């Protein structure tokens, strides 16, 4: 994600999150945060952005801060592939765990995360400012644990069965290189803000 993506991001954000959504300035601030890692999903034909996600790296924890898909692309596994992208980059920058908060009413998102081995650690009461809704706190086991990797790879195999590409978050297991240190980023750097075609 870059500053140039924000016009398209701001078309999706209020539709995805309603009145309690990030502002354009919030995204701009996040792109200047060296601990922030943000990515977009775009159409391979015309480059149109239809989803995005990202996380903060805090020590060994990748804290997912956003994941959104344009309504026209829902129920097409776009959110699932964005989550796989986050797991891939969390691994690359040295995270051992992943966590997030999700509204207790957002059962669709909860099902996605639970499908990928996230577990509920409890609730944050009155977490959301717009309506004082509680947030469910979700957390993974160590993402380098063989059982977690096996679960993720099973989900990738299921996507491949329906002819969808999905990135393997753990290429080092197959002899590929991986970066284990956090990468320095600038908001305008295309190299540090890749666009994922899903």
Where is each model-derived feature located?
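Methionine-biased hydrophobic packing positions in alpha-helices, especially
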Residues: 1, 98-100, 136-138
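Residue-level recognition of the GNAT/N-acetyltransferase active site
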Residues: 2, 70, 74, 103-105, ...
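Acetyl-CoA-dependent GNAT
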Residues: 3-4, 10-72, 83-93, 141-145, ...
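Non-catalytic, surface-exposed connector residues within folded enzymatic/regulatory domains
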Residues: 21, 76, 130-132
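Conserved GNAT acetyl-CoA-binding A-motif
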Residues: 90-101, 124
């Amino acid at each position: 994600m870059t500053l140039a993506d924000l016009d398209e991001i701001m078309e999706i954000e209020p539709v995805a999150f309603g009145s309690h959504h990030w502002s354009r300035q919030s995204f701009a601030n996040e792109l200047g945060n060296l601990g922030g890692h943000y990515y977009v999903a775009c159409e391979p034909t015309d480059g149109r952005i239809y989803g995005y996600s990202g996380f903060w790296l805090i020590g060994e924890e990748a804290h997912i801060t956003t994941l959104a898909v344009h309504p026209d692309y829902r129920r097409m596994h776009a959110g699932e592939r964005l989550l796989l992208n986050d797991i891939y980059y969390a691994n690359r920058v040295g995270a051992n765990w992943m966590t997030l908060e999700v509204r207790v009413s957002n059962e669709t998102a909860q099902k996605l995360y639970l499908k990928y081995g996230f577990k509920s650690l409890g609730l944050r009461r009155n977490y959301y400012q717009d309506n004082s809704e509680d947030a469910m706190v979700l957390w993974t086991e160590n993402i380098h644990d063989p059982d977690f990797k096996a679960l993720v790879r099973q989900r990738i195999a299921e996507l491949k069965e329906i002819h969808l590409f999905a990135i393997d978050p753990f290429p080092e297991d197959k002899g590929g290189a991986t970066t284990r240190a956090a990468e320095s980023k600038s908001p305008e750097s295309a190299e540090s803000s890749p666009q994922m075609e899903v």
